[in-house]
Amino acid sequence: MNIRVWGTSLLMFLSTVTAVGQTANRYLKAPLPQDWEESGEVFQQILPVDDHWWKSFQDTKLDSLIALAVDRNYSVAMAINRIAAARANLWIERSNFFPSIGLNAGWTRQETSGNTSSLPQTTDHYYDASLSMSWELDIFGSIRKRVKAQKENFAASKEEYTGVMVSLAAEVASAYINLRELQQELEVVKKNSASQEEVLKITEVRYNTGLVAKLDVAQAKSVLYSTKASIPQLEAGINQYITTLAVLLGMYPQDIRPVLESSGTLPDYMEPIGVGMPVDLLLRRPDVRSAELSVNAQAALLGASKADWLPKVFLKGSFGYAARDLKDLTKSKSMTYEIAPSLNWTIFNGGQLVNATRLAKAQLDEAINQFNQTVLTAVQETDNAMNSYRNSIKQIVALREVRNQGIETLNFHWNFINRDFRLSKTYLMHNVLCYLMRISWYRHKVVRFATDSPLQGFRGWLERIKINL
């Protein structure tokens, strides 16, 4: 990965965090490392406090793009939908704490058979209205544990939302920085192409006057066409990142293209990054927190499945009125009620309870393994991003030296040409063309070096993004 992607990653991962779970450590099958493999002056043993990490770019356009993405991105909308669904599931389970009450009203006409008893055949009718109630008393905690599981799932959905927001900001920033890099590279290539066209014109004039061979013209054309050949690829890359940003912003490319077609710059940013300690940092990542909460939910469901082995106690009852004549329905003599506590204990159901418990246990084990896998992946991603960011800083420093040396070489050649003006005109024209060819090459390199430093700064920012994921 290049330097751009790793730098900004680090900043994001550190910033978008939540409180550390108290139960996380008991699920870890291997203790977290006490320190990062990467340490030193580039990283600090502190945790970041700013969730809006992208504001460090000091780019108002990027700020507005991320704000727009938060409002319009469909992944964010779906994450919000999942939170709403998890909240609804929580209230569905909570409703089991309360009695179920129903209202009944009706008119009944019945006729008894005269051939089933010694009584004559009779016809009767009556009106009735009543309230009925059924209430499961959660004595052994089955309902309570299922409510706890839904609480954990609800919390996990919020962590997933946080993770979506982190990823969205990272993807927008990465695409934006890559776009800016390609736009600057395109400007450099176009400038080089213009200078190479000038050299080609001069070379053709010299060829027509017999001062140079046709090989010189062919070489000048080869350099020019090679430079021009890279332009379509850069333009295609620019279009690709514009369409990527359009999708992230929930828009069509034509709606956002006018805003992004003009090139821009980002500041060169190489200050130390606060990463804290692994035990503090990793357990605060949204993906790690979500995995931990999923373990808690499965543990609660296992407890609920075990509680299903125990008796269930119900309290049932009804209160109402019944009378043959509608006018007598509300009289005290028409009042009826029923109270019927009951106990229901399943002692055999073909192994359903046993296998339900086995299923819950297997799902808990799977969630624990997923949690440990998530932690290991988080350690790997963070270490890789930190290593890449450190090497990116070294690369930036080296490229700056190359740029400085290129500028010195260019200045030397210009000064040398200026001194040649003291020579004869014929000798001057011959050497000026030679130097123009060489200066064109050096100009290409120096302009490239001059832009490489900010481009590498872009890469450094993108590396910081990955450390924060």
Predicted regions and their residues:
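Bacterial Sec-pathway N-terminal export signals of envelope proteins
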Residues: 20-89, 266-296, 346, 375, ...
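Acidic, low-complexity, intrinsically disordered peripheral segments
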Residues: 22-23, 243-244, 253, 267-269, ...
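Small/polar, glycine/serine/threonine/aspartate-rich low-complexity segments that form flexible
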Residues: 38-58, 67, 105-132, 255-274, ...
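Transmembrane beta-barrel architecture of outer-membrane proteins
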Residues: 62-64, 85, 126-128, 174, ...
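Small/polar (Gly/Ser/Thr/Ala-rich) solvent-exposed segments
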Residues: 77, 97-121, 134-163, 182, ...
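Amphipathic alpha-helical coiled-coil segments
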Residues: 78-93, 164, 170-190, 198, ...
